[in-house]
């Protein structure tokens, strides 16, 4: 179960302590447990939302979103911000885009992107709470993290060295595809036709975002993987809120 604990530590802010430095093979296998980490986060969000029952709706939605951000430690939002800055500031140039991604400072495009994504997430969560449809709080973390597995399965990693390279190089391809298939089936079983609609929308978003990465970078980075997760979580919530 060490790969699961690696995934849980890497993807969130829960107080997980590993017994030592993981081997590259264990890092690669940890990707297989990303959807399961999404299940853990989703169940925590569902439980927290249930505790807030009776709270004013806007406050309820704001607290759920705050808990969501705290669970992930803002890791993927940071990737989204870096990607937004790099995409507009890179002017279509691969090396300039990669260089801007490494800059820890956030420009105005990053701030605007984060505000818009969080605002849309808040509005979608509010709509789901109003309609007593909480399944999105489970599906969004699961699909977002499954998308990261899918990205590493079929997309070159363009930064040599580091954690991302170890993940990409040592990911078991066959089991990874089975995990993705099982995740998709579970989403449909849980949400029925709504789950089918969510998967279709997310598939379109996934392949479009992957195509953007391939055209600009020839692959993905940790930042673009985090951006993908955030945008697919948003796609899940918006799809369910609009159905």
From Swiss-Prot:
Residue ranges crossing the lipid bilayer per the database entry: 31-51, 57-77, 109-129, 135-155, 188-208
Cross-referenced InterPro entries: CobS (IPR003805)
Keyword Nuclease: no
Function: Joins adenosylcobinamide-GDP and alpha-ribazole to generate adenosylcobalamin (Ado-cobalamin). Also synthesizes adenosylcobalamin 5'-phosphate from adenosylcobinamide-GDP and alpha-ribazole 5'-phosphate.
Regions annotated as coiled coil: none
Bilayer disposition of the protein: Multi-pass membrane protein
Keyword annotations: Cell inner membrane, Cell membrane, Cobalamin biosynthesis, Magnesium, Membrane, Transferase, Transmembrane, Transmembrane helix
MF (Gene Ontology): adenosylcobinamide-GDP ribazoletransferase activity; cobalamin 5'-phosphate synthase activity
UniProt protein name: Adenosylcobinamide-GDP ribazoletransferase
Enzyme class label: transferase
Its EC number(s): 2.7.8.26
Protein family according to the UniProt entry: Belongs to the CobS family.
Pathway membership, UniProt: Cofactor biosynthesis; adenosylcobalamin biosynthesis; adenosylcobalamin from cob(II)yrinate a,c-diamide: step 7/7
Subcellular location(s) of the protein: Cell inner membrane
One Gene Ontology term from the biological process aspect of the record: cobalamin biosynthetic process
Catalytic reactions on record: alpha-ribazole + adenosylcob(III)inamide-GDP = adenosylcob(III)alamin + GMP + H(+); alpha-ribazole 5'-phosphate + adenosylcob(III)inamide-GDP = adenosylcob(III)alamin 5'-phosphate + GMP + H(+)
Any single Pfam family the record assigns to this protein: CobS
Cofactor: Mg(2+)
GO CC terms in record: plasma membrane
PANTHER family: ADENOSYLCOBINAMIDE-GDP RIBAZOLETRANSFERASE
């Amino acid at each position: 179960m060490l790969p699961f604990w690696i995934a849980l530590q890497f993807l969130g802010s829960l107080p997980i302590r590993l017994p030592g430095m993981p081997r590259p093979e264990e890092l690669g296998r940890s990707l297989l447990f990303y959807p399961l980490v999404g299940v853990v986060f989703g169940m925590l969000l569902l439980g927290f939302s249930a505790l807030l029952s009776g709270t004013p709706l806007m406050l309820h939605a704001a607290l759920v979103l705050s808990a969501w951000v705290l669970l992930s430690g803002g890791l993927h939002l940071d990737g989204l911000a870096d990607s937004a800055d790099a995409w507009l500031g890179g002017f279509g140039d691969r090396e300039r885009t990669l260089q801007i991604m490494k800059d820890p400072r956030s420009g105005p495009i990053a701030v605007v992107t984060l505000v818009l994504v969080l605002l849309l997430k808040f509005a979608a969560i509010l709509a789901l709470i109003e309609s007593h449809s909480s399944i999105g709080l489970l599906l969004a973390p699961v699909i977002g993290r499954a998308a990261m597995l899918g990205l590493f399965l079929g997309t070159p990693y363009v930064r040599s060295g580091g954690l991302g390279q170890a993940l990409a190089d040592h990911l078991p391809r066959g089991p990874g595809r089975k995990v993705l298939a099982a995740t998709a089936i579970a989403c449909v079983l849980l949400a029925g036709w709504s789950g089918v609609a969510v998967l279709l929308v997310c598939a379109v978003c996934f392949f479009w975002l992957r195509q953007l990465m391939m055209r600009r970078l020839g692959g993905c980075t940790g930042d673009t993987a985090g951006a993908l997760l955030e945008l697919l979580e948003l796609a899940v919530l918006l799809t369910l809120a609009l159905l």
